[in-house]
């Protein structure tokens, strides 16, 4: 519901009782500001500016937000944009620590909105924004200590949108950011602030006048060099030279020359580590975390120019971080203090955790570029899994549960780059870790009770106390209600494990042992979800895992479909397995005769059908329609004619009779020797010729020519007839051909 203009103007004349309805009316009703008169509009703008000039914090805040809403209207922005910008800059200049922080945040947000509304409009940009940009940048850099996250995000936007204007302020901002990164309180900064500092630093190469891509790549190399120098500090505590592979990796890192040290983009203070002050050892892990955060910002932030990313160099430095571990590299002999050893081990774990956070983001950004390095990445991630006596250290896995979940997430991200992975041995240990994390966790017996038990065994020869043993009461509860003493697995751990297993079973053919362990876990999860979940609320990760267990059964002979269907009965994919919906079967159309090649043959086939109907009516042939079609398809047609070389011969055409056998499957055709004196020639025209063979054993046979292809009645005991036709030797074909005699049986007409 919008307020009338008179009410708004009256309320803005002094301190507004409630600014929210006024702001809602001006923001939602787009036609409100277009329909009011110029006089009322001038009153509205002037009273908003007067409120922003007030010394009362509430009135100032109301005036700033009114300017923000009014600037969304183009007509007001074109006429009053300069006044709005000048008033906001004045508020920003006069801000100090004694003023309410909300005034600063509202002013910065209003300036950002005003710049966004003006940007892209050439006239307004030239007249309003461009002259004020240097002042805005300077004030933002001066006030960055009051609202660092908000102001740095605003500066980051100005760098991207106005790199040329920002160029004179680039070095000053870089030094300011390096000071923030080097401060002792950096580790206590909020994670959001750390991220925006690194992103702003990674955006600065865009202001370079020439070759910004070379500057960007040089910064990446400088970060890698700085990391290698920090990691070499561990050589004072660990015997790094004993690991030849590790030293080979260090040699692949470019060396920093003395002349290049002054040109390095990242100049941090030197680390002061005292072995007598073990807490100073954490400076190593803090510096590694800082450098990895900057590298992450460089690798993930978008640029307006093409860059060459040294992916191999980035992976090498991460492999070095993962390889520096007390499991593989022994301590030096002069390091004997157990406290120092534990602190060094803790710093290496922190370094590895920060490295995994960086590696987890790379597949999302670079995708296929990492596939050639996939086996190498999985290999050095595998060394992070704790082992004891060639088995996974269960207690160590649980004590570093967050680290292990992040490791599984990182591994799953790299597996997702490929559709299938042929070498399943690379993932066996990761699967074992995942299954360890989701096993039931029973609460261990406390050390106090263990100590008492040992004391009781040591003093067994003493007189037993006749008093009632009070310790038996809690022990009885432990035996009778053991399920109440199981530790609950965190939901984040369950989701991370399910996502990893879901990624594995869809891309890898696991060995039988790991396959059955994974499917055993899925059956247990499905049974628990069915029996103990009254609301049938199933997480998305578990739902996807159960569906994929049906789609990718692997070695499983018995399907999990019945159990999963009882849980996910409404799933459309599972309904296809339960009620298959196949397409209709194809319908075969019977062919009705021989293939017709042209229109003439089509007409002949019609005549043929008429003849067949007449024969059926006379009762001469008692066969059904299918046998007629079959005999018609199998019939052989032979046309015989005579023609002279000069074309004047009166010799009539002679056509060879067509013979159709009664049973072609049981009777064989026996051919006689060909008589070279007999020649057969096909006639150019065709007609039905009835010929009577003078031989006593032959019967009258109806000969079929090309013009009639109907069904021919066959006598019960047909006798083959040989017809010999003599043709003049002057014909083109001088060969002789004799129609063979066909013996169809021993029976004759005499019987």
Swiss-Prot record:
Composition-biased stretches (Acidic residues): 596-628, 733-751
Keywords assigned by UniProt, alphabetized: Nucleus, Ribosome biogenesis, rRNA processing
Residue ranges, compositional bias (Polar residues): 702-711
GO biological process assignments: rRNA processing
Residues covered by region (Disordered): 447-473, 588-659, 693-751
Disulfide feature: none
Keyword Transmembrane helix: no
Entry's localization field: Nucleus
Listed GO CC annotations: nucleus
Quaternary structure and interacting proteins, as annotated: Component of the RIX1 complex, composed of IPI1, RIX1/IPI2 and IPI3 in a 1:2:2 stoichiometry. The complex interacts (via RIX1) with MDN1 (via its hexameric AAA ATPase ring) and the pre-60S ribosome particles.
Function: Component of the RIX1 complex required for processing of ITS2 sequences from 35S pre-rRNA and the nucleoplasmic transit of the pre-60S ribosomal subunits. Regulates pre-60S association of the critical remodeling factor MDN1.
Similarity annotation: Belongs to the RIX1/PELP1 family.
Protein name stated in the entry: Pre-rRNA-processing protein RIX1
